[in-house]
Amino acid sequence: MNPEPGGDYDEESPVSADLVAGDGDIEASLRPKNLHDFIGQPRVREQLQLVLTGAKMRGGTPDHILLSGPPGLGKTSMAMIIAAELGSSLRLTSGPALERAGDLAAMLSNLVEGDVLFIDEIHRIARPAEEMLYLAMEDFRVDVVVGKGPGATSIPLEVAPFTLVGATTRSGALTGPLRDRFGFTAHMDFYEPAELQQILMRSAGILGVQLGEEAGAEIANRSRGTPRIANRLLRRVRDYAEVRADGVVTREIAHAALAVYDVDQLGLDRLDRSVLSALVRSFGGGPVGVSTLAVAVGEEPATVEEVCEPFLVRAGMIARTPRGRVATAAAWTQLGLTPPPDAVTGGIEVRVNEPQASLFDPQDP
């Protein structure tokens, strides 16, 4: 797993969307091999099909491709599919691994014509490597500086025509010059429960799990719209079914297994519920700053803000305001409490008791 904010929580939570130990080998076996097998993201699939087919008809390489979206939605799988559809080799690396321009130059020099270079977390690439990448993307060449000081010379090196596929969970963190060099950008959205159920049934077949349709729906509804989480929960439910039952995953077995792992019917885990409880019971529903809220639940502010909060906002449990986080009416109801009359009704960023004209004020604590 990449060293992102989140600490030990990411390692223990079954509903963390980040890649954790134990996911890698199994995820590889579950990945779809072509666009036809890829479930969900219909608009992205259609767009990519046109881009790739057009390039093959012209006999050239397609434009560089940027895939953006939250973790666990299939960006790496899509990069592998792009290479497979083109009949090309895939070279994989990540932004944090490219610390120096020389790291990138070494990788580019080993490419052959038509290769697909996949850079995960491309928003974290070091600036010297990024600047070298500009020229490689546009002109398929790089300038390697030899020596130091006044005697340094720049040697141009040709790079075989290739397609760069970049993946990012934070497209806003990309510099403008880098973003502009991608000819096609696709944003991957969260999945519908029905799509996740299809993914679960497919994964169950590959893993040899006897999964009933109702059980698949139960797991899908708790997977936060994320295939990685769905497949992880499937493995945990499989363990429960094999150890405490006859190995067949029914709806009742799935419900009992997910209760053991503290994943409720909305997909909330221990930390999510702790944040909601603190916000409502300790701070009267807010507003409260994220740092104060993190202290109340015994976690780092980055964990609350980057790991926990996005799903709670999307689920309509928390609203972000200029004065802090506010519990919505849905959060009060989720905790079995009666919401106050002035409770916020949505999880988007809202203004509380302020005029409409200030709705788009960029301030955010």
Swiss-Prot record:
Binding site for Mg(2+): 76
SMART domains xref list: AAA
Listed CDD domains: AAA (cd00009)
Subcellular localization(s) per the UniProt record: Cytoplasm
Residue ranges, annotated region (Head domain (RuvB-H)): 265-365
GO molecular function annotation: ATP binding; ATP hydrolysis activity; four-way junction DNA binding; four-way junction helicase activity
Enzymatic class: hydrolase
Catalytically driven reaction(s): ATP + H2O = ADP + phosphate + H(+)
Domain of life, per lineage: Bacteria
Keyword Oxidoreductase: no
Keywords: ATP-binding, Cytoplasm, DNA damage, DNA recombination, DNA repair, DNA-binding, Hydrolase, Nucleotide-binding
UniProt xrefs under Pfam families: AAA_lid_4 (PF17864), RuvB_C (PF05491), RuvB_N (PF05496)
GO biological process: DNA recombination; DNA repair
Region of interest (Large ATPase domain (RuvB-L)), residue spans: 1-191
Enzyme nomenclature, EC number: 3.6.4.-
GO cellular component entries: cytoplasm; Holliday junction resolvase complex
Record: residues binding DNA: 320, 325
Region: Small ATPAse domain (RuvB-S), residue numbers: 192-262
UniProt binding sites for ATP: 30-31, 72, 75-77, 138-140, 181, 191, 228
Subunit comment: Homohexamer. Forms an RuvA(8)-RuvB(12)-Holliday junction (HJ) complex. HJ DNA is sandwiched between 2 RuvA tetramers; dsDNA enters through RuvA and exits via RuvB. An RuvB hexamer assembles on each DNA strand where it exits the tetramer. Each RuvB hexamer is contacted by two RuvA subunits (via domain III) on 2 adjacent RuvB subunits; this complex drives branch migration. In the full resolvosome a probable DNA-RuvA(4)-RuvB(12)-RuvC(2) complex forms which resolves the HJ.
General function of this protein: The RuvA-RuvB-RuvC complex processes Holliday junction (HJ) DNA during genetic recombination and DNA repair, while the RuvA-RuvB complex plays an important role in the rescue of blocked DNA replication forks via replication fork reversal (RFR). RuvA specifically binds to HJ cruciform DNA, conferring on it an open structure. The RuvB hexamer acts as an ATP-dependent pump, pulling dsDNA into and through the RuvAB complex. RuvB forms 2 homohexamers on either side of HJ DNA bound by 1 or 2 RuvA tetramers; 4 subunits per hexamer contact DNA at a time.
HAMAP family, per the entry: DNA_HJ_migration_RuvB (MF_00016)
Family the entry assigns: Belongs to the RuvB family.
Protein's name according to its UniProt entry: Holliday junction branch migration complex subunit RuvB
Organism: Rhodococcus jostii (strain RHA1)
Name of the gene encoding the protein in the UniProt record: ruvB
